[in-house]
C-alpha cells in the first residue's frame, strides 16, 4: 500500500473508504531533506543515545551522512551484513524523532485509537473501564499528561507534525484536528 501511495496510485480497494479519503499524498524529498539535516548535525555522543545505536554504528552514520543525501542513500551506505536494513531504517526514524534507549525502556503509557467500527465502540467502552493505561480517543485530552506519558506522547505528536511537512497541509498540530476514523 505504501508503495502504491508513493506512486500516486489508487489504494481505495485495499483500505476502508474513510481511510482512503484521509490519506494524503506525501513528498518523500522533504523527508530526505529532514534526515540529511538531522544526521549532519548529530555528534557521535548524541547518536549513541538513540535506540539501537551501538558497537560504533554512530561513527558510521556520521561519516556516511557527510556524503549522502536522504534516507534511502544513507541507509544503503550504512547497511552491512552485521547491521540489517530494518535496524538502520529504525535508527533513522528514531534519530529524526529523538527517541533514545531510555524512551524505549518505558512500558506503554497509553493506547491511541486511530480507527474503530461498531464492534470497536463496545470494546473501547470496556477498555475504558478496565485498562491499566489511558485510552486516547481525543488528543486534546492527553495534553495535561506529565512525565513518562508526556515524554512518549510528544514523540507521537512530532511524528505527525513531520509527516505533515511532507503533505500539502504542512500545518503542525494535525493530531488536534483529526478524530479517529469510524469505519462502517
List each language-model region with its residue ranges:
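Active-site cores that bind ATP or allylic diphosphates and position pyrophosphate for catalysis
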Residues: 2-184
Amino acid at each position: 500500500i505504501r508503495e502504491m501511495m508513493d506512486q500516486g496510485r489508487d489504494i481505495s480497494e485495499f483500505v476502508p473508504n474513510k481511510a482512503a479519503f484521509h490519506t494524503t499524498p506525501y513528498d518523500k524529498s522533504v523527508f530526505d531533506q529532514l534526515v540529511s539535516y538531522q544526521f549532519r548535525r548529530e555528534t557521535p555522543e548524541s547518536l549513541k543515545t538513540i535506540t539501537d545505536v551501538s558497537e560504533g554504528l554512530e561513527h558510521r552514520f556520521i561519516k556516511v551522512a557527510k556524503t549522502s543525501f536522504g534516507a534511502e542513500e544513507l541507509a544503503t551506505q550504512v547497511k552491512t551484513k552485521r547491521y540489517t536494513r530494518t535496524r538502520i531504517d529504525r535508527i533513522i526514524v528514531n534519530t529524526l524523532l529523538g527517541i533514545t534507549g531510555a524512551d524505549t525502556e518505558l512500558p506503554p503509557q497509553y493506547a491511541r485509537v486511530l480507527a474503530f467500527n461498531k464492534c470497536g465502540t463496545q470494546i473501547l467502552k470496556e477498555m475504558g473501564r478496565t485498562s491499566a493505561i489511558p485510552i486516547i480517543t481525543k488528543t486534546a485530552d492527553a495534553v495535561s499528561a506529565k512525565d513518562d506519558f508526556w515524554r512518549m506522547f510528544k514523540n507521537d505528536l512530532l511524528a505527525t507534525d513531520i509527516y505533515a511537512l511532507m503533505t500539502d497541509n504542512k500545518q503542525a498540530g494535525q493530531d488536534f484536528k483529526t478524530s479517529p476514523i469510524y469505519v462502517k
